[in-house]
Amino acid sequence: MAWRGWAQRGWGCGQAWGASVGGRSCEELTAVLTPPQLLGRRFNFFIQQKCGFRKAPRKVEPRRSDPGTSGEAYKRSALIPPVEETVFYPSPYPIRSLIKPLFFTVGFTGCAFGSAAIWQYESLKSRVQSYFDGIKADWLDSIRPQKEGDFRKEINKWWNNLSDGQRTVTGIIAANVLVFCLWRVPSLQRTMIRYFTSNPASKVLCSPMLLSTFSHFSLFHMAANMYVLWSFSSSIVNILGQEQFMAVYLSAGVISNFVSYVGKVATGRYGPSLGASGAIMTVLAAVCTKIPEGRLAIIFLPMFTFTAGNALKAIIAMDTAGMILGWKFFDHAAHLGGALFGIWYVTYGHELIWKNREPLVKIWHEIRTNGPKKGGGSK
């Protein structure tokens, strides 16, 4: 056993334990107090903490001939280093672990909508400028020889044929594909697990709430989420506009992850989560709430159609049941949080947040127009 190897190396653990049990050695103490099934790796880690080792001992790989070591355990032994690097230990005060994520959620949501308001202001200014620039460009194009069959021209034609919503989510899809490719780089596995999966038991709590929204490990998971996002992109951008949609989408990713944190802390079912499902549930719920009579169909089963309102009710019911019953295949708390945020925003949030952005826009306008002038100096 690994514990036996530690005792023979003479690191002082045997003496520390022997004095408290009347001279019994570590091996005798372990045999008396510990059932055989607890002499595995987890128990060794517990003993290590109690003995106060400053340096983790070298891990001893189980041999094939060791009794009590199954073939499955031997195959998994090669995974011990990366698994140990990603073991999550819940805080002894789990409620405290939600304080930083709560402040991050509120702060990020405010920054997202504030940035979106400024973005919209800048977009309106650039559109006015581009209108006059376009008149000049059209005149130059009329006298400039045109290139036929140019690849760039074909790309521009394809891009211009997309709707505003499709052009908006193209960047989101590209970011998800990039992160999916990064998961395939072995040297980045620890970084990806640390920053691109959300877990309230992790040491890094805040940044994964946003980054995990763009993270997918499974190709099918990513393809399904991006298909739904692409399908609803035109509708949601027509309802909210490009800038407001981006603020809602990014905020939804953080909010749904915070609800997931709350659910995991409340139930004690800790584990990493990733994916854009929470943010996409916000998009789906917002569209279904705004257009409840719209007709939807299931992919690969287009003959079965149903109203958007009924689809939303079914999804909420399923995620509520999954959260209560402890289904582990999906992060139902994140799905439910995203759906409720989408319903709330199109019902109340648009009036409370977006329509009250004017004071911020005026401040930004003052900064832009009354900034420091060039060529100053004393008179």
Curated annotation (Swiss-Prot):
Give the first-level EC class, as a single word: hydrolase
Q: Which GO MF terms are attached to this record?
A: endopeptidase activity; serine-type endopeptidase activity
Its topology with respect to the membrane?
A: Multi-pass membrane protein
The Gene Ontology biological process terms listed for this entry are: membrane protein proteolysis; mitochondrial fusion; negative regulation of intrinsic apoptotic signaling pathway; negative regulation of release of cytochrome c from mitochondria; protein processing; proteolysis; regulation of mitochondrion organization; regulation of mitophagy
Q: Mitochondrial matrix side of the membrane: what ranges? A: 53-101, 188-207, 263-272, 319-332
Q: Which reaction does it catalyse?
A: Cleaves type-1 transmembrane domains using a catalytic dyad composed of serine and histidine that are contributed by different transmembrane domains
The transit peptide is at: 1-52
Per UniProt, subcellular location reads as:
Mitochondrion inner membrane
- Pfam families linked to this entry: Rhomboid
So what does this one do?
Answer: Required for the control of apoptosis during postnatal growth. Essential for proteolytic processing of an antiapoptotic form of OPA1 which prevents the release of mitochondrial cytochrome c in response to intrinsic apoptotic signals. Required for the maturation of PINK1 into its 52kDa mature form after its cleavage by mitochondrial-processing peptidase (MPP). Promotes cleavage of serine/threonine-protein phosphatase PGAM5 in damaged mitochondria in response to loss of mitochondrial membrane potential.
What protein name is recorded for this chain?
Presenilin-associated rhomboid-like protein, mitochondrial
